[in-house]
A protein has these predicted regions:
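Core beta-strand elements of the Rossmann-like FAD/NAD(P) dinucleotide-binding domain
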Residues: 4-6, 184-193
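N-terminal Rossmann-like FAD-binding beta1-loop-alpha1 element of flavoenzymes
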Residues: 6-32
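Active-site substrate-recognition segment that forms the wall
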Residues: 22-23, 51, 82-83, 198-324
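Glycine-rich FAD pyrophosphate-binding loop
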Residues: 26-45
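Dinucleotide-binding Rossmann-like beta1-alpha1 core, especially the glycine-rich loop
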Residues: 48-126
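Short beta-strand to alpha-helix junction loop
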Residues: 63-64, 91-100, 139-158, 302-307, ...
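Helical element adjacent to the flavin cofactor pocket in flavoenzyme catalytic cores
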Residues: 140-178, 189-193
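C-terminal catalytic lobe of FAD-dependent flavoproteins
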Residues: 274, 282-288, 294-376
């Protein structure tokens, strides 16, 4: 069996692994990334492509998200990745939603967020697909960006190879890691630092560590339309009232329980499947819609059309576009550790697991990787 070496070995070429490779290589390290597929096929390519700082609470997590955003702007420009700094617009069609948004604005407008309250007519100007019937107003944020995750995850490896000399090894399964050795079918790699960024695959490497952590998996269902006619644009990425219940940025709002109570009473099926709805638009003009949240270690590979219909029904309460015909449906699975924003475990002197960003990988990975490569 051949032996090769690197300063840093990264297992997994999803966004977490690529971020670890980027910040390691930027520090002058010789880096190799080993990925089991010919290109990462997991949650990193099955999401909205949203860099979403507005969802993170003020403090360290918002700072991490904003650092990630800065890195995305730099990397996308250099790698030829389409990135749109289109911001986000959170719509409120009910008074309890408007109460939460106003409270959030009053307590967070000077906490690092770049936000403003907008009236219903301004919301319609910003996003022509907004439905104005019953619209109270919205929360406009300028920090959110959109990429096409399929393009980004495809182009980042070549960028890392060309600019930083990162060696990308695709179609290769890591079978074991012991001390400073990473074994594949035909090569044993030696590395001073090893980062395991295996996404939703908890079973192959260090399964006992994952089992002890209490980490689980989340399945989300998503859809994509065709290209919108006449170069129609959504404007800022959109969301509505249920999104206020999903993100940690809003959890301390004293007005949130009233919204939670109404949602459980009036929309029990949406709550059951963890549905809140986001709308993003990629560079081709296609709309990406979703999503739902089902949790467990053995999630069904079969999607529920009921969930897709619930998503589309709720979407129809606040948004419409020229062409809402669905061209693609899929699901993604990401790791989640309840009550935590990431799972970082030092399993040996050489090896660290970096995982479990709980659905915020596009938003937080570059910032987390910067922090970890500074201290490990």
């Amino acid at each position: 069996m051949k032996e090769k070496s690197a300063d840093v070995i990264v297992v997994g070429a999803g966004i977490v692994g690529l971020a670890m490779a980027y910040h390691s290589a930027k520090k002058g390290k010789k880096v190799v990334v080993i990925e089991r597929s010919q290109q990462a096929q997991g949650a990193s390519i099955r999401n909205f492509g949203l860099i979403w700082p507005i969802g993170q609470p003020s403090g360290p997590l918002l700072d991490r998200a904003l650092r990630s955003r800065s890195t995305w702007l730099e990397v996308a420009g250099e790698a030829g990745i389409w990135l749109h700094q289109n911001g986000s617009l959170q719509l409120a069609h009910h008074q309890d939603e408007w109460d939460v948004i106003n409270e959030f604005y009053s307590t967070n407008s000077h906490e690092g967020f770049q936000i403003e309250l907008v009236a219903a007519d301004k919301a319609k100007q910003l996003s022509p697909g907004t439905k104005t019937a019953g619209l109270k107003g919205g929360l406009l944020s300028s920090t959110e960006c959109t990429v096409d995750p399929r393009e980004a995850i495809s182009k980042l490896p070549g960028y890392l190879e060309k600019k930083y000399g990162v060696e990308m090894v695709f179609g290769t399964v890591v079978t074991s890691i012991e001390k400073d050795q990473v074994a594949t079918a035909d090569i044993t790699w030696r590395g001073e630092k090893i980062f395991v960024c295996s996404g939703a695959d908890f079973e192959t490497l260090f399964p006992e560590t994952f089992q002890q952590s209490g980490i689980t998996k989340c399945k989300l269902q998503m859809m994509r339309t065709g290209v919108q006619p006449h170069a129609w644009k959504v404007g800022p990425s959109l969301c509505a009232g249920l999104t206020l219940l999903h993100y940690g940025a809003f959890k301390d709002c004293k007005s949130l329980p009233a919204l939670q109570t109404r949602a459980q009473t009036d929309m029990p099926d949406l709550i059951k499947w963890g549905i809140h709805v986001l709308v993003s638009q990629n560079g081709n003009g296609e709309l990406v819609l979703g999503d739902s949240h089902e949790y467990g270690l053995s999630l069904s590979p079969f999607d529920r059309e009921e969930i897709n219909q619930l998503i589309m029904s709720y979407l129809g309460t606040f948004f419409e576009a020229h062409d809402m015909a669905i061209n693609e449906r899929w699901h993604g699975v990401y790791p989640k550790l309840e009550g935590k924003t990431e799972f970082v475990a030092r399993v040996s002197d050489h090896t660290t697991i970096v995982n479990g960003l709980s659905g915020a990988g596009m938003t937080l990975s570059f910032g987390l990787a910067e922090e970890l490569t500074n201290i490990l």
